[in-house]
């Protein structure tokens, strides 16, 4: 997390900050939160927690369960996140290219993601013809260590940064194929950096495969990633691997529009 400047602290309003911390808590928990949750997370007394929660609910950003008294994120928050995604300039720029990519692989899901601190966020997705849909929906956070997008978006960060991220986020095991060793992860990210391809072969979701490639800006920095993914019942791992040349071609075109010039 970036350090606050002196000016930021000078103009900071503590109550407003706590309200946003409560919303962050609700997002992180991904379920209803209680007064006790807020007390523990923010180190405030129950009376303050009650007042903060009810103030946010009165503003329409939390819904209160009349039976349990717990609070959950409201549809107003969903509208905010949807508007944020729709206003993302990168998302608007890449959509035509993602649609063309989907027409080449209609059985696959086409995804675009970005890194925001320790978080890997899906900001766009075109679903394949086949159902069911998987976890990758716009606005969702996915782990960095076992997804194709996570790997391409972190492969240039450096060993010390990756180790620190792993300590903060953990290397949770989702399937028998998930990388849970920091040494194995560092080797995998080095391969990702060298080949400019992030691979997820049943690491995050059982029987789901993904290939991802980076998008660069004019400074040669990775600013996003795009991927092709599908359940094995729709496309085999070999078919997902065969998508890589077209995937790279699409990413190169997007990077070129952003001003990137490969050496």
Predicted regions and their residues:
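N-terminal helix-turn-helix
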Residues: 2-87, 92, 252, 256-260
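Short, structured helix-loop boundary elements
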Residues: 12-16, 70, 74, 87, ...
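Short, acidic, Ser/Thr-enriched surface-loop or helix-capping motifs
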Residues: 66, 115, 216-218
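Short regulatory alpha-helical segment in sensory/regulatory domains of signaling proteins that mediates
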Residues: 98-106
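Short, hydrophobic-rich beta-strand element in sensory/regulatory alpha-beta domains
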Residues: 107-114, 120-121
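Short hydrophobic alpha-helix segments
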Residues: 124-126, 226
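Short, solvent-exposed recognition segments
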Residues: 132-204
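Extended hydrophobic
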Residues: 178-250
């Amino acid at each position: 997390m970036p350090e606050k400047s002196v000016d930021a602290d000078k103009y900071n309003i503590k109550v407003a900050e706590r309200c946003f911390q409560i919303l962050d808590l609700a997002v992180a928990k991904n379920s209803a939160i209680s007064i006790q949750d807020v007390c523990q997370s923010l180190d405030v007394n129950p009376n303050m927690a009650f007042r903060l929660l009810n103030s946010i609910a009165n503003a329409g950003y939390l819904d209160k369960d009349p039976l349990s008294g717990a609070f959950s994120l409201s549809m107003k928050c969903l509208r905010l996140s949807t508007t944020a995604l729709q206003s993302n300039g990168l998302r608007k720029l890449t959509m035509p290219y993602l649609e063309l990519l989907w027409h080449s692989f209609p059985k696959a899901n086409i995804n675009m993601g970005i890194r925001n601190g320790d978080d890997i966020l899906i900001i766009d997705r075109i679903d394949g013809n086949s159902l069911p849909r998987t976890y990758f929906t716009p606005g969702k956070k996915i782990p960095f260590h076992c997804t194709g997008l996570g790997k391409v978006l972190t492969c240039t960060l450096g060993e010390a940064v990756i180790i620190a991220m792993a300590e903060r986020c953990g290397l949770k095991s989702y399937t028998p194929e998930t990388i849970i060793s920091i040494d194995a992860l560092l080797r995998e990210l080095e391969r990702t950096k060298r080949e400019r391809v992030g691979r997820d072969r049943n690491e995050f979701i059982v029987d789901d495969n993904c290939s991802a490639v980076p998008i660069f800006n004019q400074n040669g920095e990775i600013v996003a990633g795009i991927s092709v993914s599908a359940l094995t019942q729709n496309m085999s791992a070999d078919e997902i691997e065969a998508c890589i040349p077209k995937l790279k071609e699409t990413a190169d075109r997007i990077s070129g529009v952003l001003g990137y010039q490969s050496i």
